[in-house]
């Protein structure tokens, strides 16, 4: 008998744990379909411009018919391997995003505590080896201490927690990821979840004496 999903490809583009995508894959295949994951890297502007990065996990024969759609959404598709690898890659990238957000926020707050002019330290960081596309995108937020969300802190916290949990399930732990995940959990609990990911600065500032 024909199964419900015969001839259909189901693609999950949301950010969930690799283990969750593997569970969905089993359900889809049991119904006769094919499954792949394709979370994206990039926020509002890349999504609008069609310059997202597509982080694909799945079989090559599933990827091929999807390339035209991915070409509209993003500037490049990375094929990481089987289902679970694409979502794992997304957690790697978003863990870096969280760690960078924490590190730059602490650096900006440290400069304030040392009595250093914010605009001057931002220019110095931007001219150093510690510059990055993220810093250039977010530097005005730290300068103004206002954090309208491009990627909300609550979503960064969710992804960091996913990364920590996946590592624990595999019997592993990474200290920076765990520490930053806890910092972001505290920021969400303190009411900063709707701020940009760089808004962890506000939680750190509240705990400091400047």
Predicted features by range, described:
Residues 9, 14-95:
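Rossmann-fold dinucleotide-binding core
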Residues 7-8, 107:
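Short, proline-enriched alpha-helix->beta-strand connector loops that line the catalytic pocket
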Residues 209-210:
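Conserved small/polar residues in nucleotide/adenosyl-binding loops
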Residues 85-204:
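Helical "substrate-binding/catalytic lid" subdomain
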Residues 1-6:
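Short, conserved loop/helix-junction motifs that constitute active-site signature segments
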